[in-house]
């Protein structure tokens, strides 16, 4: 076994980003700066849920990874498959142990999110559209968990809704982008089943719904710092229109949506901090 493989299988860069989004969810909901202890706990619970999910995903995907990603820890023999399972379970347990310090609601929410990461890797991942929705739900759950960690939801609820909708759109675009490889692997993604054009239209619908939803925080008095959301909406609309006109633009579109999501999170944070201004 390779010691570094236990870090590698977590995919720490992704988990750190998820933890930061959890913290941003706390800040947006709190409309200020909560205690460092709570922010630290939110970060760790989100990080461990993400890392456990990545580990268990590699456990279930071992046969596919032997073909597509042979350099990953399990296929190359750096971590025995059974050890990876135990390692994932350990991370889940550590995360839940920490979540209890944030209260019952935060603990139960973490338990549900952790369970979804396991079920997704085990059964949902290959299912057309359902797998896309599961990923989007987990993405949306991150800022909500941050909000629960500080005892209120507030504007983080609107952030979560927008995150869910835009990530359904993005996940479908990613499936359009990967259609050739997925067909060779015998996968049954939405674009393979209904075609790239129809899948692009569904992706576009979720993009437009995101833009519509982004106006809801204005009704509850979000601050002027929310103004960059106009740029976000323009980026989402352009990507949504482009993918319908030309499904081959899905690769560029999903990257655009990723950048737009980051700007949106910052917009929500600035809007929360300037509320009443």
Curated annotation (Swiss-Prot):
Cofactor(s) required, per the database record: Mg(2+)
Location relative to the cell: Cell membrane
Disulfide feature: none
InterPro entries for this protein: DGGGP_synth, Prenyltransferase_related, UbiA_prenyltransferase, UbiA_sf
EC number: 2.5.1.42
Gene Ontology biological process terms from the UniProt entry: glycerophospholipid biosynthetic process
Main location: membrane
Top class in the EC scheme: transferase
Keyword Lipid biosynthesis: yes
Keyword Ribonucleoprotein belongs to the record: no
Coiled-coil features, chain-numbered ranges: none
Segments crossing the lipid bilayer: 16-36, 40-60, 101-121, 129-149, 153-173, 205-225, 257-277
Catalytic activity reported: sn-3-O-(geranylgeranyl)glycerol 1-phosphate + (2E,6E,10E)-geranylgeranyl diphosphate = 2,3-bis-O-(geranylgeranyl)-sn-glycerol 1-phosphate + diphosphate
Pathways per UniProt: Membrane lipid metabolism; glycerophospholipid metabolism
Keywords: Cell membrane, Lipid biosynthesis, Lipid metabolism, Magnesium, Membrane, Phospholipid biosynthesis, Phospholipid metabolism, Transferase, Transmembrane, Transmembrane helix
GO terms for cellular component: plasma membrane
Alphabetized GO MF terms: geranylgeranylglycerol-phosphate geranylgeranyltransferase activity; magnesium ion binding
Membrane topology designation: Multi-pass membrane protein
Function, as annotated: Prenyltransferase that catalyzes the transfer of the geranylgeranyl moiety of geranylgeranyl diphosphate (GGPP) to the C2 hydroxyl of (S)-3-O-geranylgeranylglyceryl phosphate (GGGP). This reaction is the second ether-bond-formation step in the biosynthesis of archaeal membrane lipids.
PANTHER family: CHLOROPHYLL SYNTHASE, CHLOROPHYLL SYNTHASE, CHLOROPLASTIC
Entry-linked NCBIfam families: PRK12883.1
Family: Belongs to the UbiA prenyltransferase family. DGGGP synthase subfamily.
Protein name as it appears in the record: Digeranylgeranylglyceryl phosphate synthase
The organism's taxonomic lineage, starting at the top: Archaea, Methanobacteriati, Methanobacteriota, Thermococci, Thermococcales
